[in-house]
Amino acid sequence: MKKGVLLNADISAVISRLGHTDQIVIGDAGLPIPATTTRIDLALTRGVPGFLQVVDVVTQEMQVENAYLAEEIVKNNPQLHEALLVLLTQLEQRQENQIALRYISHEAFKEQTKQSRAVIRSGECSPFANIILGSGVTF
């Protein structure tokens, strides 16, 4: 049995295949997922698993260089936005790097998901609880 924090085989496989600048998306239950993109559906019921919980576990396995958020999260989901910023700051400290954070419109965000290797769907049911994570290198 795997000893690490991340036990989901599909997510683990996607992360192990990421190269520098490849992207994955962690989304809420309502984020549209392009038909051509790998879907990893974790949603069990409303709020389970939560968005931040999924981001926390995934980023313990993935080296993150940059991230995209929908700019709408700032006004429409300020508590989640603040919690996510704390999580990203902690990740920067663990990784000993700076994560470039970019805000784009939700429409542009949805377009950008088409470039990702996978979309991980959480059970989160709050507005704009989505992030695109760009893969970095560990050296």
UniProtKB/Swiss-Prot annotation:
Its EC number is 5.4.99.62. Pathway: Carbohydrate metabolism; D-ribose degradation; D-ribose 5-phosphate from beta-D-ribopyranose: step 1/2. The active site is at 20 (proton donor). Keywords: Carbohydrate metabolism, Cytoplasm, Isomerase. Substrate binds at residues 28, 106, 128-130. Gene3D superfamilies: RbsD-like domain (3.40.1650.10). SUPFAM superfamilies: RbsD-like. It comes from the Bacteria. GO terms for biological process: D-ribose catabolic process. The keyword Cytoplasm applies. GO terms for molecular function: D-ribose pyranase activity; intramolecular lyase activity; intramolecular transferase activity; monosaccharide binding. One of its GO terms (cellular component) is cytosol. It catalyses: beta-D-ribopyranose = beta-D-ribofuranose. It is found in: Cytoplasm. Catalyzes the interconversion of beta-pyran and beta-furan forms of D-ribose. Belongs to the RbsD / FucU family. RbsD subfamily. Homodecamer. This is D-ribose pyranase. The lineage of its organism: Bacteria, Pseudomonadati, Pseudomonadota, Gammaproteobacteria, Enterobacterales.
